[in-house]
Amino acid sequence: MTKADQIFKANIQKIINEGSLSEQARPKYKDGRTAHSKYITGAFAEYDLAKGEFPITTLRPIPIKSAIKELFWIYQDQSNSLDVLEAKYNVHYWNEWEVDQTRTIGQRYGAVVKKHDIISKILKQLAENPWNRRNVISLWDYEAFEETKGLLPCAFQIMFDVRRVGEDLYLDASLTQRSNDILVAHHINAMQYVALQMMIAKHFGWKIGKFFYFVNNLHIYDNQFDQAQELLKRQPVASQPKLVLNVPDGTNFFDIKPDDFELQNYDPVKPQLHFDLAI
């Protein structure tokens, strides 16, 4: 069993056994019912990407291609436009969070990246001093939240550090997430930011190192417990999936394309499970 599957099953079981029930929940299902959840706080995981430990489950198929396209929309296009997301990447699921018929998700995610020119600043300071301890990407912008409506960012902060091991430099990343629907989005979000880590590492010709993942509120919605039990029953495949970025070292961050990523050794358990999303 892969490390990701071990952690996934353990967290599902912990939420079922020890989780707290939500109160005054904000999300709704499509039928208008309040989407309550059972949750734990302070979930943490560590993966050594250099040793082939990738944070993706084999217990159900994870839509990695669309997840990576969403990441490009945020950090390369630096956009909040749903039209850009659909026309360029054929990704539609963010339509559920359109703000006031603006064809945007409000001043969130890519709009905040663009507002602060975050990627250019991160690349510049890593180039000037790889060992600086100030490599923080934060999407938590109170001014932007007051400017427009919109879903507040779930995965909102990632930090980078560089380590030397022998002659090689390794880029580590630490992702902080305020809230995460473990059955649907956990491995999507983790692998998105592993992809971002890989893009920055490739930009400098470094190797990928460790990936640390902290979720403040890790939950299962109250209409997902049958799926949770099904996942606990499933036997994972033995092979370890691996995400590969097929571009030469030193490729500029903004020249990398979604199709440059390849998920190898991925043969997840089927069939896919259905989830009614909470909006």
From Swiss-Prot:
It is an enzyme of class 2 (transferase). Keywords: Cytoplasm, Methyltransferase, Nucleotide biosynthesis, Transferase. InterPro entries: Thymidate_synth/dCMP_Mease (IPR045097), Thymidate_synth/dCMP_Mease_dom (IPR023451), Thymidate_synth/dCMP_Mease_sf (IPR036926), Thymidylate_synthase (IPR000398), Thymidylate_synthase_AS (IPR020940). The active site is at C154. GO terms for molecular function: thymidylate synthase activity. SUPFAM superfamilies: Thymidylate synthase/dCMP hydroxymethylase. It is found in: Cytoplasm. Pathway: Pyrimidine metabolism; dTTP biosynthesis. Catalyzes the reductive methylation of 2'-deoxyuridine-5'-monophosphate (dUMP) to 2'-deoxythymidine-5'-monophosphate (dTMP) while utilizing 5,10-methylenetetrahydrofolate (mTHF) as the methyl donor and reductant in the reaction, yielding dihydrofolate (DHF) as a by-product. This enzymatic reaction provides an intracellular de novo source of dTMP, an essential precursor for DNA biosynthesis. Homodimer. This is Thymidylate synthase. The lineage of its organism: Bacteria, Bacillati, Bacillota, Bacilli, Lactobacillales. The gene is thyA.
